[in-house]
């Protein structure tokens, strides 16, 4: 297990605040009850008064405090959750209808809607209040130097992998400086903590998220040609790569030809309840022994690091959360993202004249390419499959590859390596056209293609990263991979999937007035559900993917936009 990380961002004082907020969270559950209870709300509360808040909490009745007593306590000692992120003035690079915006979107309803989605960037743009840096002991929010674009709703702070699709949308909106601000905020986190945090909160310092920082930098460079920006962020890309190459993330697997391959896994530095969901984690772990609880909490945090929290993908038994085994899984998508990172770093190093570094990372990407195809590729299914390590607790220096250890359940992640075809750093295509077509056929037969997009899995477990939910990032990764595969038929399928996704987003927006975090891909126009919190709106990555699809494919005058 990875070592437990101390809460960063304010040292002992930050730990003390978080401890207080978790006690408030627990007391609030007793006072308000479980219906519509969101534990994250309470660890996001800024402390408005001094440390007497702890004594006042202790003085509440030993029996469950009443609703009124709890409301009065919170009102007396805390500011509103999210009040330490202040609405920013309109970003200076925002224009209501920027020149060159979506020139191939011809249908009036489609264009009007796209402009409304574009305008949402104003609503989601924030600045961290100066009080956060002045009094870090009163905030779980971390200070950041630039403007931030938040996902929306309960997600009041910056999140790592969400930011990639926010950046993609901002580039379509010609908001290049705001896109750079987002990246520089993440670089600030790398410089301070050694990696990009899951999100900009002190309680997220124990884990990261799918690593897409280099992809953001590459897309911004391709849009702007800003070499100074590349030079500024390049050292942080190297630092982040080192984080993912650390011993706790690395796994060595020997194939049947005796070749040893190094791949990566998720591994949070935590073995306690997640502060933002502590009451939920404690309930799941209530019947476990102390040692089993620590293992469970570690797996829960590691699963949160995947971005897929939660899914049957990570469970030995999809009906039992305590069977999460994420740190014993070599994920297809994580290794895709790290290979892309290595390609990007090789490209940037060559660009800025560091030829030796470029060669090192080019070789690293080729080695990971071979590893992915040797360990994760399944020729019978024509898909890449997650690889499960033994879960008996016996760590091995090198694991012997076994066919039976590939997880043959079908997930959208099985097709994510196609996305490596879409990279623009001038290196060779990851999947040749013939293989891409075979993977496309496998996708068509998989059961994942639904009327409103690509389902996340085939298992309807009630978890949000399972059937029938579809998520914007997965649509985008697979569509871009198909699009750049070199096959005309794959391009047609890519456009068909994008069309389904645009239509369901449009109809849901017209029905609710909002963009949603996820969608039910069985029914066009229906938002998604499931998971440990209520469905959210806003929504950063959904907005970014819609703008990207409209930019890529346009929308002809004679093509209907609704379901």
Swiss-Prot record:
Gene3D superfamilies for this protein: 1.50.10.10
Class of this enzyme: hydrolase
Keywords from the named record: Glycosidase, Hydrolase, Stress response
Signal peptide segment: none
InterPro entries recorded: 6-hairpin_glycosidase_sf, 6hp_glycosidase-like_sf, Glyco_hydro_37, Glyco_hydro_37_CS
Tree of life domain: Eukaryota
Catalytic reaction annotation: alpha,alpha-trehalose + H2O = alpha-D-glucose + beta-D-glucose
Assigned GO CC terms: plasma membrane
GO biological process, one term: trehalose catabolic process
Entry's EC annotation: 3.2.1.28
List of residues binding substrate: 154, 161-162, 198, 207-209, 274-276, 307, 532
Annotated TM spans: none
Example of a GO MF term: alpha,alpha-trehalase activity
Active site location: 309 (proton donor/acceptor), 517 (proton donor/acceptor)
Family: Belongs to the glycosyl hydrolase 37 family.
Protein's name in the database: Probable trehalase
């Amino acid at each position: 297990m990875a070592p437990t990380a101390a809460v960063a961002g304010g040292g002992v004082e930050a730990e003390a605040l978080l401890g207080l907020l978790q006690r408030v969270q627990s007391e609030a559950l007793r006072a308000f009850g479980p219906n519509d209870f969101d534990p994250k709300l309470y660890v996001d509360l800024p402390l408005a008064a001094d440390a007497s808040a702890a004594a006042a909490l202790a003085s509440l009745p030993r029996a469950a405090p009443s609703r009124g007593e709890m409301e009065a306590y919170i009102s007396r000692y805390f500011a509103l959750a999210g009040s330490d992120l202040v609405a920013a003035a309109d970003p200076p690079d925002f224009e209501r209808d920027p020149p060159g915006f979506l020139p191939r979107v011809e249908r009036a309803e489609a264009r009007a809607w796209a402009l409304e989605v574009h305008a949402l960037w104003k609503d989601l743009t924030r600045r961290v209040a100066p009080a956060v840096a002045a009094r870090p002991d009163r905030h779980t929010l971390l200070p950041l130097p630039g403007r931030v674009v938040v996902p929306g709703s309960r997600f009041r702070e910056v999140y790592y992998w969400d930011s990639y699709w926010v950046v993609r949308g901002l580039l379509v909106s010609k908001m290049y400086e705001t896109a750079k601000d987002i990246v520089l905020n993440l670089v600030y986190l790398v410089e301070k903590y050694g990696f990009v945090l899951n999100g900009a909160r002190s309680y997220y310092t124990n884990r990261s998220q799918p690593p897409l920082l280099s992809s953001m930098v590459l897309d911004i460079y391709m849009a702007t040609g800003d070499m100074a920006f590349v030079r500024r962020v390049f050292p942080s890309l190297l630092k982040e790569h080192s984080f993912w190459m650390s011993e706790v993330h690395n796994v060595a697997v020997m194939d049947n030809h005796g070749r040893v391959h190094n791949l990566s896994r998720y591994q949070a530095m935590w073995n306690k309840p997640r502060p933002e969901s502590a009451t939920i984690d404690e309930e799941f772990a209530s019947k476990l022994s102390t040692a089993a609880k620590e293992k469970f909490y570690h797996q829960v945090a590691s699963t949160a690091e995947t971005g897929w929290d939660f899914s049957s993908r990570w469970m030995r038994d999809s009906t039992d959360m305590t069977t999460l085994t994420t740190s014993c899984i070599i994920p297809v998508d994580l290794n895709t993202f790290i290979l892309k990172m290595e390609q990007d770093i090789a490209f940037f190093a060559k660009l800025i004249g560091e030829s030796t570094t470029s060669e090192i990372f080019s070789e690293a990407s080729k080695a990971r390419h071979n590893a992915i195809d040797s360990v994760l590729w399944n020729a019978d299914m024509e898909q890449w499959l997650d690889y499960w390590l033994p879960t008996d607790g016996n760590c091995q220096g090198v694991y012997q590859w076994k066919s039976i250890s590939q997880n043959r359940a079908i997930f959208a992640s099985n097709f994510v390596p196609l996305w490596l075809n879409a990279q623009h750093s001038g290196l060779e295509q990851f999947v040749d056209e013939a293989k891409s077509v075979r993977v496309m056929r496998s996708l068509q037969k998989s059961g994942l293609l639904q009327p409103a997009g690509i389902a996340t899995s085939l298992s309807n477990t009630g978890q949000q990263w399972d059937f029938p939910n579809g998520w914007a990032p997965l649509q985008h990764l697979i569509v871009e991979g198909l699009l750049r595969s070199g096959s005309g038929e794959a391009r047609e399928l890519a456009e068909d999937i994008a069309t389904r996704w645009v239509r369901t987003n449009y109809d849901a927006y017209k029905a609710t007035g909002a963009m949603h975090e996820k969608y039910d891909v069985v029914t066009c126009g229906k938002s998604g559900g499931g998971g440990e919190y209520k469905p959210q709106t806003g929504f950063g990555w959904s907005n970014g993917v819609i703008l990207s699809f409209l930019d890529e494919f346009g929308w002809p005058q004679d093509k209907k936009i609704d379901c």
